[in-house]
UniProtKB/Swiss-Prot annotation:
Example of a GO MF term: 4 iron, 4 sulfur cluster binding
Stated role: Component of the cytosolic iron-sulfur (Fe/S) protein assembly machinery. Required for maturation of extramitochondrial Fe/S proteins.
InterPro entries per the UniProt record, alphabetical: Cytosolic_Fe-S_CAF, Fe_hydrogenase, Fe_hydrogenase_lsu_C, Fe_hydrogenase_ssu
Entries under SMART domains matching the protein: Fe_hyd_SSU
Binding site for [4Fe-4S] cluster 1: 23, 68, 71, 74
GO biological process per UniProt: iron-sulfur cluster assembly
Protein name (Swiss-Prot/TrEMBL): Probable cytosolic Fe-S cluster assembly factor CG17683
Alphabetized PANTHER family for the sequence: NITRATE, FORMATE, IRON DEHYDROGENASE
Family, as annotated: Belongs to the NARF family.
Gene Ontology, cellular component aspect: cytosolic [4Fe-4S] assembly targeting complex
Alphabetic keyword roster: 4Fe-4S, Iron, Iron-sulfur, Metal-binding
Organism: Drosophila melanogaster
Amino acid sequence: MSRLSRALQLTDIDDFITPSQICIKPVQIDKARSKTGAKIKIKGDGCFEESESGNLKLNKVDISLQDCLACSGCITSAEEVLITQQSREELLKVLQENSKNKASEDWDNVRTIVFTLATQPILSLAYRYQIGVEDAARHLNGYFRSLGADYVLSTKVADDIALLECRQEFVDRYRENENLTMLSSSCPGWVCYAEKTHGNFLLPYVSTTRSPQQIMGVLVKQILADKMNVPASRIYHVTVMPCYDKKLEASREDFFSKANNSRDVDCVITSVEVEQLLSEAQQPLSQYDLLDLDWPWSNVRPEFMVWAHEKTLSGGYAEHIFKYAAKHIFNEDLKTELEFKQLKNRDFREIILKQNGKTVLKFAIANGFRNIQNLVQKLKREKVSNYHFVEVMACPSGCINGGAQIRPTTGQHVRELTRKLEELYQNLPRSEPENSLTKHIYNDFLDGFQSDKSYDVLHTRYHDVVSELSISLNINW
């Protein structure tokens, strides 16, 4: 299992929807019935042996993403990509091959290597190595450059665009009274659950706006490729994310461009995998060069490279859209920081805007599978929608506590670690999505805001996945 992503290891399923009770590919092992049981032991090399029957070595099971087509458990994607294509081993292989091609001047096969860093992994690595957040981003640039990266970017511009698209989508739906409650779509674990468990019921309510990762894929494979005059297929785009499900999101066929013969994101590695790479290199992050992140989008660099979006920890969707809708629909300018009211637990919160004693906006944040289940049941029971918008994330505490974030190393409780990361996030500068750069991208590359082109590349669609089970097996996880 060392060759595979840790997404298949049961110890790392914190960020996944609770696994389905039925596996679509239980491996059948033919064996004679025995009156006595057998013990299985794990050898030093990781192999399994049936120890009381002559030390019989057991065969390793290989599972691809396609095998897990209809599973809503640890692997949740319908794409036909082996999981080894989303591993640090595959990344190192590509980087080594590219380095050899450069050395031999085989320019036809040299690829431009682009890394994109999400905010949450930067925070996780900054805390792990006890360095400042901006310095952590700069050290990561130095590290990835040492591996052969040509560009190292942040998701800041994609985060901004995602909020601009999502807020406009909400206002349009609200004014047309269509498909409300609107549900956020940036969490791939939640989207996969919606597709495979509640299909036709939930999907009309899910926002069509792409996640920042996939918007970044468009920016890199189309806009940056045009700037460099390089075909998209000659760019290898790697993202660093806080959650394993982002690997599966990148593997969706919806995010493969037939015109460019290329995926928007070729490989996803996670915070914990970066930590493993640094451990294997036997050199802490702080010992790599301090290099500013690249900013190929305009001539003017922002003052900072790592930004927060509102107070909430998963992109700021609920807070930002609530403020925008209040101002543009009800002429209420909410300049103060919003306070969400905690309901049954800290991962289910809501906020209400009233005018003349009437509730005109009601938003919620639902993190974690328990709250997602409660939300879905609530939506099913109500004939008239109770919420206008819900920010939904599969992980308790949201993306800051993604299952691929670095775990505590000194006996520290995960909640304490999450609180420390929250403090780092709250101290980041706040980004205002409607800025000169996003306007420049819309006007110069996307034919303007709300154009047909911008909708085509910044929005996606979802699929009602129907499971046809040939074998049923109950599993207790």
